[in-house]
Amino acid sequence: MLTPYAYHLVNVFAETYFGGNPLAVFPQADGLTDQQMQLIARQFNLSETVFVHQTTESSAVRKLRIFTPDYELPFAGHPTIGAAFVLHQQLNLPETYLLQTQAGLVKLFHEAKQICFGLQNHIDVEVIDDNLPQYTQLLGLSESDIAQIAWINTGSRQLLIQLTSLNALKTCQIHPALFQQIVKQSALYLWFVEQNQANVRLFFGSNGAVVEDPGTGSAAANLGGLCLKNGLTPLNWRIYQGDEIQRPNRLTLQVDESETIYVGGKVIAVGCGELFVPSGEGEPSQGCR
């Protein structure tokens, strides 16, 4: 037996129709098992696929489960914003509400031209100040290209490396073996900022390869957390990501006096459909109805 599940395709952090970070949203995913959600994420083979369930928190409108093709994430920015875009239309939600993630509750804000999430979580910071040659080899750069190295977690733990020039950001070459050794199942976020514009790149591992992500909200939140710890707030930055892989993403990052981190961007709907999920693994498909 095949059960149809509706999905929506959206581009998050997009300012052009084929820009942004693509996302599949399943707005009614109750009934899917963890294994089925993982297999569906692998089928779509996007950086993440998000599944919406009834919430277990009375203050939240829905619960999100976020999967890469290889594993589940406790939190990720572009799936949260993309799911919010779909749910806001389907459920006629107010301009501000809460969504539940595996990392906790996230507050969403719908503004005139974009959707933002706000975090006020505990920020874990581990600054790396030794073994610099290992990181220069990881990036294929020199020591003078690196300004700061730190592990940050505002919802998803990632390695952030600040670079000293835009050229270093554009020309770095990631060493796959060292990436697997140092970053493992986390992500590497490289950033350079000048005059309130941050240019960034994010890399993650998938099936033994190093893949570049076009737009990453959780890493932008971690960047805000690092700036908060470094005393660089309040701030209002525009983030450029994805240009090196011809998939331009544009994000906003704000940190206010209350130490709340806001990450936002525009969302463009590009498609929808149904996926037929078998009740038993290996059941033959009966095709479209």
UniProtKB/Swiss-Prot annotation:
Pfam families: PhzC-PhzF (PF02567). GO terms for biological process: biosynthetic process. Coiled coil: none annotated. One of its GO terms (molecular function) is isomerase activity. Keywords: Isomerase. Its EC number is 5.1.-.-. It comes from the Bacteria. The active site is at 48. InterPro entries: Phenazine_PhzF-like. One of its GO terms (cellular component) is cytoplasm. SUPFAM superfamilies: Diaminopimelate epimerase-like. The keyword Isomerase applies. Belongs to the PhzF family. NCBIfam families: PhzF_family (TIGR00654). This is Uncharacterized isomerase PM1503. The lineage of its organism: Bacteria, Pseudomonadati, Pseudomonadota, Gammaproteobacteria, Pasteurellales.
